[in-house]
Amino acid sequence: METQATLNSIQKAVWDGRLPLQIRLAPSESRIYDQTDPYLISYPRISYLPSLLPRLRAFFASSLIDPSSNAHDGWFSFEGVPLKWHLPIGLLYDLYAGADPASKGTAESEDAGWDIDDQDNPLPWRLVVHFSDWPDEELVRLDAEGMVMNDAFINSVKEADFLRNGTAKGIMSLSKEDSSGLWKSVQNVELSSFQRISNILLPPLNQPFRNIPIRIFLPLPPDSGSPSLKIVQSPVPPLIPPSSVAASQLALSRSSITPQTQTIGSALHSLLPNLFPSRRTPVLAKPVLHGAAVPMSAPVEELVRSSAYGDGWLYVVIRMMG
């Protein structure tokens, strides 16, 4: 297990990650159709799209055909697909934009600036915001007070807490101040406040998780014609039991057998053996987390401690190779 200082350093890098966005008002809602100036912003990857709605409503106010629309009426789409507002922005980009996982070279070029007129460049990520015609069949409506978003986040935290500890007592026993503070720290990207509260929920380093809170997002076939997401979720223990040993041998030599550390490679091989025939080497596909390819040897528990999103989940996107 890496030291707490190393895990904190990785977590800081994750929270510092930002994504350039170019957001346009839906032409059908604009007084000047597609001539409305876009809204440009570099936004934290761990944040959520609804947090942008108040400023977008104000920015596009003079262009809206319907001036009675509210900020919480807003929703986003990418290439005609409504985006799930309960998923972090960075995850949505990794799912839909189709860019290759970041390397040192690409990261440097992103920092150098971006050309908003280069339609072949995946950055900035080009989104459309709508303030009417809510897609009720695909998205739950938001509310003016932000409680729908808050409740969705806290429920996700509860699920992750239950998987890690076998109980959700941790999140349920948080004070009201800490419970609301956890969500506010993610909204405001305040890592120190987040760490203070999340450390209450995480078992100490010398105490393994019960299971790993991980969701794996699979690519859809090009001809699927469906914008829905395919998600794999199954209990993944942080340690691999020595199941290859016969029961009789196990009983005799239990004291001498130590479980192996579960890596992202071993977890994917177990859950998706056709895509990941090898535990050590990506052959057909590779796991992507926060825009970067994850080493197959990375222990899953360390990934959760250092690289989980604000709700405590590892959201891993599978990208096909070749």
Curated annotation (Swiss-Prot):
How does it get modified after it is made?
Conjugated to atg12; which is essential for autophagy.
Please name the GO terms that the record assigns under molecular function: Atg8-family ligase activity
Q: Which Gene3D superfamilies match?
A: 3.10.20.620, Autophagy protein Apg5, helix rich domain, Phosphatidylinositol 3-kinase Catalytic Subunit, Chain A, domain 1
Does the record carry Transmembrane helix as a key word? no
Q: Which GO terms describe its biological process?
A: autophagy of mitochondrion; cellular response to nitrogen starvation; piecemeal microautophagy of the nucleus; protein transport
Record's subcellular location: Preautophagosomal structure membrane
Membrane topology of this protein = Peripheral membrane protein
Q: Which InterPro entries match?
A: Atg5 (IPR007239), ATG5_HBR (IPR048940), Atg5_HR (IPR042526), ATG5_UblA (IPR048939), Atg5_UblA_dom_sf (IPR042527), ATG5_UblB (IPR048318)
Specify where it is mainly localized. membrane
Q: Which PANTHER family match?
A: AUTOPHAGY PROTEIN 5
Task performed by this protein:
Involved in cytoplasm to vacuole transport (Cvt) and autophagic vesicle formation. Autophagy is essential for maintenance of amino acid levels and protein synthesis under nitrogen starvation. Required for selective autophagic degradation of the nucleus (nucleophagy). Also required for mitophagy, which eliminates defective or superfluous mitochondria in order to fulfill cellular energy requirements and prevent excess ROS production.
Supply the name of the protein.
Answer: Autophagy protein 5
Q: Which organism is it from?
A: Aspergillus oryzae (strain ATCC 42149 / RIB 40) (Yellow koji mold)
| Organism ancestry | Eukaryota, Fungi, Dikarya, Ascomycota, Pezizomycotina
The gene behind this protein is: atg5
